[in-house]
Amino acid sequence: MDATNLKTRMNTKVQAMEAAPPEDLWNPSDSGYLALSSNALDLIKENLKQQSLSFQLFDLVKSPSGGSTVFSVPGLSGEEAEKELTGIILDYMTPRAYWATPDPVEGTPPTCLSKDSLISADGKVCAHCPFNDFGSKDGESNAKACKESVLLFLLRPGSVFPLLVRVPVTSKKLFLKYTTRLVSRLTPLSSVVTKITLEKATSREGKPYALFHFDAVEVLGSEEAEKVREFMDIVHAADVEPVFTEAD
């Protein structure tokens, strides 16, 4: 084969590759999730014996400190380091909490708590609270005294029980932006597989912290999406009273 013919064939192949449509993640597929392809739902109901789930039964992943880009995930042999978390976000909460003391002991219940960042446990409107103002936290410029976060219920491929992932306030807008992009495609949050990664960032005060990033990597098929809705019913029925600690 002469060089001219070879060059012609190579150019034809390159043009065909460029013309081919990219793989579309929005084409639904079966994800192979253990919880969605077995009798996991029946097993959970049988083992719980009609008892509601509580926060303490969920494994919790907190935001890493010091700008670390590695998650610490509870496992059977202790904490396991993972660079990313992939799963189906069944649901989420937007809690917030306030401590009257500047440095409470870890595990101390907050002075005030809200499950949705809108109304406190005693019925007050969070938007009208002075501790919701920027700069209200002592010793930190422009920080709020009332601590916000996002709590995700993440169903992972090899588990039949969702993992709780706490997203700090510094990444709250990034998560809400992600959910908004899904809405723009008329896609429920729970119908996609989400990948969560971390990026090191630095605050205006020079303190390192981790930014959360969210990407949709797969869309569930109709049968799996229906099973996800059944799992969501269990989460919604759970007695989830978020446990807050100052040292996240």
Which positions does each model-derived feature cover?
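Generic detector of well-ordered alpha-helical segments enriched in charged/polar residues
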Residues: 7, 41, 45, 176-183, ...
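Intrinsic-disorder-associated interaction segments
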Residues: 37, 78, 168-171, 175, ...
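Generic surface-pattern signal
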Residues: 49, 53, 180-187, 219, ...
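Long, highly charged low-complexity segments enriched in Glu/Asp and Lys/Arg with interspersed Ser/Thr
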Residues: 96-99, 204-248
